[in-house]
From Swiss-Prot:
UniProt KW keywords: DNA replication, Nucleus
Subunit architecture: Heterotetramer. Consists of four subunits: POL2, DPB2, DPB3 and DPB4.
GO biological process, one term: transcription by RNA polymerase II
Region (Disordered): 91-114
Taxonomy, superkingdom: Eukaryota
Protein name: DNA polymerase epsilon subunit C
Origin species: Yarrowia lipolytica (strain CLIB 122 / E 150) (Yeast)
């Protein structure tokens, strides 16, 4: 009996990852399993990053996840040290006088004028 290789489901487009990899002149041929492995690794990385970001939002009793939560997750988690120089370039969304997070601007209909 010969078994067919099981197809691995990923949430990121394998064909696009392969195309990105091949666009680099330093990379020659790409094995068939490589983009799939990269897609799965990217998926696991994103799950970890999002979970840490959500934890930051929960610790601050926030109902919404904001960029400041992502920044704090990167700064406080050793696993994401390689992202620290990227997030440090972005300002915090914290009001300096009160230390509270800025409220997002409300979108929607304007109140009726009398």
């Amino acid at each position: 009996m010969s078994e067919k290789p099981r197809e691995i489901k990923t949430r990121f487009p394998v064909a696009r990852i392969k195309k990105l990899m091949q666009s680099d002149d330093d990379i020659g041929k790409v094995a068939q399993a490589t983009p799939t492995a990269v897609a799965k690794a990217l998926e696991l990385f994103m799950i970890s990053l999002i979970e840490e970001t959500c934890n930051q939002a929960r610790m601050r009793n926030s109902k919404r996840v904001s960029p400041s939560h992502l920044k704090q997750a990167v700064l406080e988690t050793e696993q994401f040290d390689f992202l620290q120089d990227i997030v440090s370039k972005h300002p915090d969304a914290v009001a300096p006088a009160t230390g509270e997070e800025e409220q997002p601007k409300r979108r929607g209909r304007k109140p009726a004028q009398e």
